[in-house]
């Protein structure tokens, strides 16, 4: 089973259609949002290997894992492999991430769980002050996405990380805004 993120449905069908007949392989997939689980079946181990290689080459970075690897676990592994720390600019983003990362092994090495950012008694208010100052003339009710970006930028600078995230809460959904470098 391969796990993909952001792979368009049409490309999945086209990639499976390119399986060589001698592989005697087929694939089924199920998507939820932008995440797709793709199961490959073949009559032989060689056919399975070639079909999986074909899919990996077709989708490249869209493939984030295989088997039971969750998107959260893949993100933690990637951050750890690149020696990166992810900081949060606000409690809403912290709550969204904590619920997904708290049981992932190694998450504490790559995510601050708010201890160095929004939840810190000194740093949290600094993040908010810097974010509001950046938006300056937008008044008491700035656009939620612009405010989230400003919070992520402020958290990244104040905490000293290359990656920071903040949450824009809208009427119908939540948007996580990631600021890189």
Language-model region placement:
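An accessory alpha-helical subdomain
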Residues: 1-51
